[in-house]
Amino acid sequence: MSDERYQQRQQKVKDRVDARVAQAQEERGIIIVFTGNGKGKTTAAFGTAARAVGHGKNVGVVQFIKGTWPNGERNLLEPHGVEFQVMATGFTWETQNREADTAACMAVWQHGKRMLADPLLDMVVLDELTYMVAYDYLPLEEVISALNARPGHQTVIITGRGCHRDILDLVDTVSELRPVKHAFDAGVKAQMGIDY
């Protein structure tokens, strides 16, 4: 391809991008869902949270399922003022106690509702929330109500597999991560700094 043809093609791309950017004038918080069976949902959420913190935004995090064990994202973000509230039971397949898991979910969800109502928070991450709805630990209607009542500038990120259709219908952006290949399938164990 000649330099002239390349320049013409890139100019067409630029014109299309510029037109789309010019059309996007609304400023408000959005709701993002990272879902699917692939690796990287929580990683994507925390990458976005780190970006927000880097721009001086206030961020709150509620982690369902993963428990209180140390992780890199918390080690990085907590010293920068990010509040973490973590479901104390950890992985539900380890506890195998529906009553205790439901109670732990509801306890940490109270912090989630507080964060979603807080006008000082620019972003709230609800990590693994989808499971709480799917397992009936958390009423869907309560989640939707809290999302709808949040301050208009606040962005929310929800992660987890199998996001409920009613939540997907409500949100602004959905990214579905699809597994192509994963080291764990080849017997490589989860690694600090990569997987947690």
Region spans (language model):
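Extreme N-terminal, non-catalytic leader segments
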Residues: M1-I30
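Conserved RecA-like P-loop NTPase ATPase core
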Residues: T42, V125, V171
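Conserved P-loop
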Residues: I30-A117
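Short gly/ser/thr-rich secondary-structure transition/capping motifs
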Residues: K14-V17, C105-Q110, V156-T159
